[in-house]
Curated annotation (Swiss-Prot):
It holds the Pfam family SDH_alpha. PANTHER family: UPF0597 PROTEIN YHAM (PTHR30501:SF2). It comes from Elusimicrobium minutum (strain Pei191). The lineage of its organism: Bacteria, Pseudomonadati, Elusimicrobiota, Elusimicrobia, Elusimicrobiales. This is UPF0597 protein Emin_0811. It comes from the Bacteria. Belongs to the UPF0597 family. GO terms for molecular function: L-cysteine desulfhydrase activity. One of its GO terms (biological process) is L-cysteine catabolic process to pyruvate.
Length: 423
């Protein structure tokens, strides 16, 4: 098994809109297609993280509407699971009208699934006596179970062979292993990674049309509040893409770690830094491969959806490591960079996907570039301080322990606050 290829296949793909509500729509589409009749009633069971991430974010092709429920109900009516994470490009005014009618008639509603620690979506649909259901779990596109009228149509049981689970292997990899994987990325890998760069640059153009975080950040440069330099330029670029995604603009973005905003940071930061530093294209693309691997590695420990902000922390770790990698920094310097960024923004909370994510993206970009150049100059936070470990791997594992073990109540409190906002 080639871990890089597995990460690219499972975690790096085009997504239109915030990935959690899109995954809800995808799950609904599978259930509706299996039912084979117009859906008269639907119940959406979501893990707390998916509920949180889809509550306030705008949905593509809905004229600015928000939320998992509308996305999922639209997915029921589209019923084209073959569209995968671009399913909402098929949302039409007619579909939205029918979706809103189902919601208004109390025929479609959401429940937060209890005690689900990992990514989990279940959609149950009905038409008279006929029923169907779909479960997507562990990743945004992995169908784990499909049923119709009580009969299991499909079930994806986890393999008992550890070598079949790329995430387990990724979690056991060392930083040295990940560097070697990036070094040996082949032309197919690099071509796909370049496609992601181009896709995200195109999304940046769409974000430029909005008067949001990227716009106001650029205005501070025009007013000489901030200097025009590599760091500021990269922050503006990344903010524009996040602005576009969170505003529901119907433009695809290449994800990383199964997240579009993480793809913004993990891809565009090493791309722009490398380009401005006149690094050869092949090296830049390999550094982005390393960024994807690092992002995926962090999320093995912190969880797919976490109380911690993934687009800032996990993707920021990937970006910081990638910058050092493309500057031919050694293992020690990459370790210092990773320790620096985790020490800086390792406690940033996730309170769901929304326009404010662009602010966190900007903070991540700033921290990643600073952390990388400090590491390149042999400066970094050591294991004598806080939760920083002796190695980058240990630091990331400590962060994961804080996220999974130490912050369960934090996530519950955030979700409880957000539930009160649902009318």
């Amino acid at each position: 098994m080639n871990l890089l290829k597995e990460v690219l296949k499972n975690q790096v793909y085009p997504a239109m809109g915030c990935t959690e509500p899109v995954s809800v729509a995808l799950c609904a589409a599978y259930a509706a297609k299996e039912l084979g009749k117009p859906v008269q009633k639907a119940v959406f069971y979501l893990d707390a993280g998916t509920f949180k991430n889809g509550l306030a974010v705008r949905i593509p092709n809905t004229s600015g509407e928000r939320g998992n429920l509308l996305a999922g109900t639209a997915g029921l009516l589209i019923a084209k699971p073959q569209l995968k994470m671009e399913i909402l490009k098929a949302a039409t005014p007619s579909i939205l009208k029918r979706a809103k009618q189902l919601i208004d008639d109390k025929k479609a509603f959401i429940k937060v699934a209890p005690c689900k620690k990992h990514f989990y979506i279940k959609v149950e649909v009905e038409n008279g006596k006929d029923k169907a259901s779909c479960v997507i779990s562990d990743s945004h596109t992995t169908v784990s179970k499909l049923t119709k009228n009580g009969k299991v149509i499909f079930e994806n049981k986890p393999s008992k062979k550890k070598e079949d689970n790329y995430k387990q292997l990724l979690g056991k990899a060392t930083l040295k292993d990940l560097i070697a994987l990036a070094d040996n990325a082949d032309n197919t890998d690099l071509k796909y990674i370049k496609k992601g760069v181009e896709m995200n640059l195109n999304a940046c153009k769409e974000g430029k049309k909005l008067k949001k975080v990227g716009f106001f950040l650029e205005s501070t440069v025009e007013k000489s509040i901030l200097q025009k330099n590599l760091v500021t330029e990269t922050k503006i670029m990344a903010a524009r893409v996040a602005d576009a995604r969170m505003d529901g603009i119907a433009v695809p973005v290449m994800s990383s770690g199964e997240s579009g905003n993480q793809g913004v940071v993990a891809i565009l930061v090493p791309y722009n830094v490398g380009k401005k530093s006149k690094v050869k294209e092949e090296k830049i693309l390999k550094s982005i491969a390393f960024s994807h691997l690092l992002n995926g590695y962090v999320k093995v420990y912190t969880g797919s959806l976490s109380p911690l902000c993934g687009c800032a922390i996990a993707a920021g770790v990937g970006a910081a490591g990638a910058i050092v990698y493309q500057q031919n920094g050694d293992l020690k310097k990459i370790t210092l960079a990773i320790n620096n960024i985790i020490s800086d923004i390792g406690g940033m909370l996730c309170d769901g996907a929304k326009s404010g994510c662009a602010l966190k993206v900007v903070s991540s970009v700033d921290s990643a570039i600073r952390a990388a150049y400090m590491g390149l100059n042999n400066y970094g936070i050591t294991e004598l301080e806080g939760f920083i470990g002796k190695t980058a791997e240990e630091t990331i594992q400590n962060l994961g322990n804080i996220s999974i073990t130490g912050m369960c109540d934090v996530d519950a409190v955030i979700v409880d606050i957000m539930k009160k906002k649902v009318k």
